[in-house]
Design a protein with these regions (language model features):
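Patatin-like phospholipase
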Residues: 1-23, 34-335
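Gly/Ala-rich beta-loop-alpha elbow adjacent to hydrolase catalytic centers
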Residues: 25, 29
């Protein structure tokens, strides 16, 4: 995932003696930020990046609300932070999520870190939105819906100097709508022992599936047809290679389908106000990197480091200027 670039940015900052007092993250930034704020070193984070598997983070468990319930992601984060609450982290931390029904930003600054990251990373329609608290609480979805680059939120929490890492800043080529089939949009589904791959136009995405749990969960599940039928009985009645027509309620453009499936890198960009709120903006080269593609981890970490290395002079200047302003304010107040 593109979030691996955040690790490279952190590595560069610490290599130059710069350690943030607060970390505010959205989606993948919330995941990496939680692990870092809990006290993990860049070297430890790189080791985690090298060993983590998709199946450590996701498992398909279809329901009317989404395909992935986020429980594995939640447990993984809690394990990495040694099951400590956010308020026990050595670095202040906030995960940004979107309150689903009001479409407003919410920050999680205390409590269970894994649940905060799950909320911040729950891509609508792909992940089942967690309800917090579980009984009588509100539902939350991916923070990128309202704060892809949460710089203004960081400022509202008291940040003096904001170093922002925008892993969505690099524009991707727009899909060629002329290449789409004109009659009956369809998706090619293939399965094997490891999971399911879905091909839409020139895009292919693979999701690991626990086949036994998929069958058990989907049995008798009232999901909208035909997508529900596909997911519910795919292991019983659909061949290993087949084309399935998409229902009318699903997107009809490749870019929209990619977003629905979780490939948010196609079109999402930060709000201009959030870009302007950054004292220093770091934009790693993300060419060819999909949000859920974890096959190019070393390159993405390195791109994050290189992009941050290039901004170190600007970061140090911003820190110096902020200290100068603060001293001037103190002297003015005392005179």
């Amino acid at each position: 995932m593109r979030g691996f670039a955040h690790i490279g940015a952190i590595k560069s900052l610490e290599a130059h003696g710069i350690r943030p007092d607060m970390v505010v993250g959205t989606s993948a930034g919330a995941l990496v930020g939680a692990v870092y704020a809990s006290g993990k070193t860049p070297s430890e984070m790189i080791a985690l990046a090298d060993t983590v598997k998709e199946t450590d983070l996701i498992e398909i468990t279809p329901s009317q609300q989404g395909l992935i319930d986020g429980t594995r992601l939640r447990h993984y984060v809690n394990e990495q932070v040694n099951h400590r609450p956010i308020e026990a982290f050595p670095i202040r931390y906030a995960a940004v999520a979107t309150q689903m029904h009001t479409n407003t930003a919410v920050t999680f600054r205390t409590g269970e870190a894994g649940l905060a990251v799950q909320a911040s990373s729950s891509v609508p329609k792909l992940f089942i939105p967690p309800r917090i608290p579980k009984i009588g609480g509100k539902k939350y979805v991916d923070g990128s819906q309202v704060a892809l680059l949460p710089t203004r939120i960081a400022k509202s929490l008291g940040a003096d100097i904001i170093i922002a890492v925008d892993v969505m800043g690099e524009k991707q080529a727009s899909p060629n709508s002329n290449a789409l089939p004109t009659q009956g949009s369809s998706i090619n589904i293939q399965r094997n022992h490891a999971g399911i791959s879905a091909t839409w136009g020139d895009k292919t995405m693979t999701a690991p599936v626990n086949l036994d749990k998929l069958n058990q969960t989907a049995r008798g599940l009232p999901i909208d047809i035909p997508l529900g039928d596909l997911l519910g009985v795919i292991m019983q009645s659909i061949p290993t290679n087949t084309n399935i027509s998409l229902p009318k309620q699903l997107p009809t453009k490749t870019s929209e389908f990619a977003r629905w499936f979780g490939n948010l890198g196609a079109n999402l960009t930060a709000e201009p106000e959030d870009i302007r709120a950054a004292d220093v903006l770091i934009r790693p080269k993300m060419t060819g990197a999909a949000v859920f593609d974890s096959t190019d981890r070393t390159r993405l970490i390195n791109e994050g480091r290189l992009a941050t290395d290039a901004q170190i002079p600007a970061i140090k200047k911003a820190i110096k200027d902020a200290h100068t302003r603060k001293r001037t304010q103190i002297q003015t107040a005392q005179s």
